[in-house]
A protein has these predicted regions:
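Sec-dependent bacterial lipoprotein signal peptides
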Residues: 1-16
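A residue-level marker of the well-folded mature domains of exported/periplasmic proteins
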Residues: 1, 17-377
Length: 377
């Protein structure tokens, strides 16, 4: 079915724009549901797709894109969302295994919690592909497909470096750093990439953190992590820092946010504290090119986002599924980096893309990821 997968990928230019319109806050029962189509089992059986939640726009896109590609290629699929509940995701995976899945594609909620259920999958010769989040502490994960998450952080750090003129000795500037969910392996890579750029400037005094929440090393990243990547939690944390450490003439100059969900909450906290778009507005980073954040960029409330075109990730994973089921060699390009504590997982890495307000139309509209109408352009 390789040709079918390749052909189906051509449909995603339109699908990306359509899926962006899917609600971020659907009916509560939708997360637990599945979306299945029928195809002859002899063509490859059922492909189980386990996504973490519908509450973030990007996972809606990931699930829709991957499901569409696999169905167009003739595979039966079971797409399920777990409402960010680990036990629910485990139950969904077990049901997929019992239902005759031949491949499981898993975007895990907790990368350390799936060992037993995936061991059951391995005992039944079911191939497991970790989708964008590494599954840890088990040998029952066969492949991993993701974006270069360290590079994502590097791009955020370099953007801050360039915007503030740090390499030219400018400063001091007040920095407030955030990190992602401590149970998400990717969050470590995001932070390490950025902190490898920024920590030298913290140590030199060019970047100062009034809250004191500047990790001394990459290994301490989880101390500033926001569990579950929640916008509301990020907003509350930023409000606390602003209220506790910023008064009078003390202003925040830059906020390192690892993704758009956190950036959305941080921007709301900044607005509530009286920061308005313009010359005095802090540099604020992000990742994912979520629609609300792109609109914030247009409005001057966010400085950049690192775009991971999830259509390309879906295409790559669909290709890997097809290679597995056809008995061919599965395409990977990194067999050294992603050690899950038990094994180094063969990985395919995709490159991310920096988007700033001036390049929104070029990258996001020109590619069909959003329409101009969606963004109010």
């Amino acid at each position: 079915m390789a040709a079918a997968v390749a052909g189906a990928a051509l449909l995603l230019g339109g699908l990306g724009a359509c899926s962006a319109e899917r609600t971020e806050d659907p009916e509560p029962t939708a997360d637990a549901g599945s979306e299945e189509t029928e195809a002859p089992a002899e063509e490859g059986g059922m492909i189980g797709i386990a996504m973490p939640t519908r509450s973030l726009e990007r996972w809606n896109k990931d699930g829709a894109n991957l499901e569409a590609l696999l169905q167009e290629a003739g595979y039966e699929t079971s797409l399920q969302y777990a409402d960010n509940k680990v036990d629910q995701q485990i139950t969904q995976l077990q049901n997929m295994i019992n239902g005759g899945a031949t491949v499981l594609v898993v975007a895990s909620i907790d990368g350390t919690a799936l060992g037993p259920v995936l061991a059951d999958a391995a005992s039944k010769d079911i191939t497991v592909i970790a989708y964008d989040r590494l599954i840890n502490e088990t040998d029952a994960v066969d492949y991993y497909a993701t974006f270069d998450n360290y590079q994502v952080g590097q791009e955020q750090g370099k953007f801050i470096e360039e915007q503030l003129g740090l390499a030219d000795g400018a400063g001091p500037f007040n920095l407030e750093p955030f990190a992602g969910s401590p149970d998400d392996t990717n969050a470590k890579f995001f932070f390490s990439g950025a902190w490898d750029v920024l920590l030298p400037y913290v140590e030199s005094g060019q970047l100062v953190t009034p809250s004191g929440k500047a990790p001394a090393s990459n290994d301490d990243w989880a101390s500033i992590g926001i569990l579950g990547w929640g916008s509301d939690d990020a907003q509350a944390e930023m409000e606390n820092r602003l209220n506790s450490f910023y008064s009078g003439d003390v202003k925040v100059d830059v906020v390192l946010s690892p993704n758009d969900s956190l950036a959305l909450g941080i921007a709301q906290a900044l607005e509530g504290a009286g920061y308005a778009p313009g010359d005095g507005y802090p540099v604020l980073t992000g990742q994912d090119a979520d629609e609300a954040n792109v609109k914030n960029m247009i409005a001057g409330k966010q400085s950049m986002t690192v775009w991971k075109d999830t259509r390309t990730l879906a295409t790559q994973v669909a290709t890997m599924v097809d290679e597995v089921l056809s008995g061919g060699e599965v395409t990977v390009n990194d067999e050294e980096t992603y050690d899950n504590g038990v094994k180094v997982v063969p990985t395919f890495l995709l490159p991310p893309q920096v988007v700033v307000p001036d390049t929104i139309e070029e990258h996001l509209v020109g590619s069909g990821y959003f329409t101009a109408e969606q963004l109010g352009l």
